[in-house]
Amino acid sequence: RSILIIMGVPSYFSYLIRNHKEMLIKIFNFKKQINNLYFDSNSIVYDALRILSKEYDTYKNDDLFENELINIVCINIENYINDVKPNKKVLIAFDGVAPVAKLEQQRTRRHKSMLEKKVMNHICGEKNEWNKTAITPGTNFMNKLNTNINNYFKGQEKQYGLEEIIFTGSDEPGE
């Protein structure tokens, strides 16, 4: 039984590539059938944002930018499914509301990030960019992302040759 897991642990994948090259198998040379594919999808949003943010100034407003960002996330997830070709289950999960113990840590990190940004803007001049804190459970962006991802993949099991697609949005508790 084969399971492929794509995780969103910062720097963990690059650590594996550097230190355990023998673990990597090119997916196109992988001969066994993959049954289940699990996505920790927040990293997919950040990957799409990294690419799209270079074009932020070309969008008339944040809604258009966010719609394009969501579209890219859907397409990227779909491409991963098509490349891996699991035959049973796909789980698409986004981080939900964190446990109380972690909320303070996140709040402190966001506050520090905002202060650093203010200092850099003062030194280098203000950059016009989309507010990344929108990638937080409960924001309008994440609610819109939840709805769109759910609608994009809902009832599409046959199209991908799957038994089940499970979506867990950011409105559900847990990480």
Regions found by a protein language model. Give the residues of each.
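Noncatalytic, typically N-terminal accessory segments of nucleic acid-processing enzymes
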Residues: 2-175
